[in-house]
């Protein structure tokens, strides 16, 4: 599932690597267990794309109900809440607010 959070934030690569991300070419990847569940989450950051996938720890198969927005069963919602909490932590630890004004001024000065 794609998250649009990187439209407003930039990744601090050093902080992301310190947090536990692994650098693979131009991509940052994180794999972390979701506490209290039998799942783990893979977070992939490539450019301005942040992708989150949830997998079963025993079978390594993707937990597809997580990706269905209309699925509001209690268990799926609890998994989503844990993922959202992880994303909030990542936002606090690894991301910095984009300064659009400075980016525009920089772009204008280059043209």
Regions found by a protein language model. Name each.
Residues 9-49, 60, 111:
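Ser/Thr-rich, low-complexity intrinsically disordered terminal regions
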């Amino acid at each position: 599932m794609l998250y649009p959070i990187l439209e407003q934030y930039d990744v601090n690569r050093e902080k992301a690597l310190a947090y536990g991300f692994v650098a693979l070419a131009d991509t940052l990847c994180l794999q972390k267990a979701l506490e209290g569940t039998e799942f783990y989450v893979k977070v992939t950051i490539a450019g301005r794309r942040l992708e989150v996938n949830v997998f079963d720890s025993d079978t390594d198969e993707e937990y597809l109900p997580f990706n269905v927005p209309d699925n509001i069963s209690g268990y799926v919602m609890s998994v989503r809440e844990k993922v959202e909490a992880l994303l909030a932590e990542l936002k606090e630890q690894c991301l910095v607010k984009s300064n659009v004004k400075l980016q525009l001024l920089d772009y204008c000065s280059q043209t």
